[in-house]
Swiss-Prot record:
Protein name: Large ribosomal subunit protein uL30
Keyword Ribosomal protein found: yes
Lineage: Bacteria, Pseudomonadati, Pseudomonadota, Gammaproteobacteria, Oceanospirillales
Family under the similarity heading: Belongs to the universal ribosomal protein uL30 family.
HAMAP family noted in UniProt: Ribosomal_uL30_B (MF_01371_B)
Keyword terms: Ribonucleoprotein, Ribosomal protein
This protein's encoding gene: rpmD
Gene3D superfamilies for this protein: Ribosomal protein L30, ferredoxin-like fold domain
PANTHER family with a match to the protein in the record: LARGE RIBOSOMAL SUBUNIT PROTEIN UL30M, MITOCHONDRIAL RIBOSOMAL PROTEIN L30
Organism: Alcanivorax borkumensis (strain ATCC 700651 / DSM 11573 / NCIMB 13689 / SK2)
GO biological process: translation
Family annotation (SUPFAM superfamilies): Ribosomal protein L30p/L7e
Pfam families referenced in this protein's UniProt entry, alphabetically: Ribosomal_L30
Length: 60
């Protein structure tokens, strides 16, 4: 089983690129301050790297 990491949305997606909004939605984040636990896979890591200026990773 893959390890879990916590991701928190710290900035708004308003006015951001549509691809970046899609990454945030793909991570399961809905609103500022929302934290989700996701599996630590290469695809999830790629989404986090793409929107690193919007999210904060807590489980490293």
């Amino acid at each position: 089983m893959a390890e879990k990491i916590k991701v928190k949305l710290v900035k708004s997606t308003n006015g951001r690129l549509e691809k970046h909004r899609a990454c945030v939605r793909g991570l399961g984040l809905r609103r500022i301050g929302h934290t989700v636990e996701v599996e630590d896979t290469p695809s999830v890591r790629g989404m986090i790297n793409k929107v690193s200026y919007l999210v904060q990773v807590e489980g490293e």
